[in-house]
Design a protein with these regions (language model features):
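Bulky hydrophobic segments
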Residues: 2-108, 112-115, 121, 125-143
Length: 143
């Protein structure tokens, strides 16, 4: 890899990290808001949650949560793919997927749902599998 490619690669990784951090802030705001921000804008009713597709596994896994956590997790895995940070980002993503859903016990107009928690975790796992399958490798493992 020549010097220009390394610089370009570093810039891309920095951009992905930036998008990951901004996405996390937005996720936390949307998750902790008492009601549905999307429902407020789309339906003019904060009590209605828009549904992208039907839920998975006979309504046991929230499709919206799977999609969101696939995207955010993939950004995290790409941005923090170095061997030293990969364990931390993986732990963080599983932690945040559980923690944010548990916070719904304490937020008015929100409620803990097992299918949402399952969707969060499935999203992280699917993203991790996709990342590990397609990740470029060096001789000694991670980049």
């Amino acid at each position: 890899m020549n010097n220009n490619s390394k610089i370009r690669s570093k810039k891309i990784v920095h951009f992905v990290k930036f998008v990951f951090h901004i996405s996390n802030i937005i996720l936390i705001i949307f998750y902790l808001y008492p009601g549905s921000i999307f429902g407020c804008f789309i339906y003019n009713d904060c009590g209605i949650q828009p549904q992208l597709t039907r839920d998975f596994a006979s309504n046991m896994i929230s499709s919206n949560h799977v999609y969101v956590f696939i995207i955010i997790s993939f950004l995290g895995f790409v941005g923090y793919s170095k061997k030293t940070t990969f364990k931390y980002i993986t732990t963080y993503l599983f932690f945040i997927s559980v923690f944010l859903e548990l916070m719904h016990f304490a937020i008015p107009e929100r409620g803990f749902e097992t299918k949402d928690l399952a969707g969060n975790i499935v999203g992280v796992v699917v993203s991790l599998i996709i990342f590990l399958i397609f990740k470029p490798r060096k001789k000694n493992g991670f980049i």
